[in-house]
Amino acid sequence: MAVRGYVLIEAEVGKAKAVGEAVRKLSHSDAKVVAVDTVTGPFDVIVQMEADDLDKLGNCITDGIQRVEGVQRTTTCLSVRLG
């Protein structure tokens, strides 16, 4: 079963647009970027991702998203099926 996660990104001041564009262009063999949105509020960019397993999702976040220039901090929320 695929793992779906939402990566909430805090960007450096004035860098949200550039971070969103860079993340949109990321190519990683372990996971797929499904959607990237710049948003208002405590986070600047929200990324929806899918991977075959949790390790692959984590690798894409640490090797890809967290290395994008302008990314200060990430918080990852995993999608779960309840009930």
Where are these regions (language model features)?
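A compositional/biophysical signature of low hydrophobicity enriched in polar/charged and small residues
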Residues: M1-G83
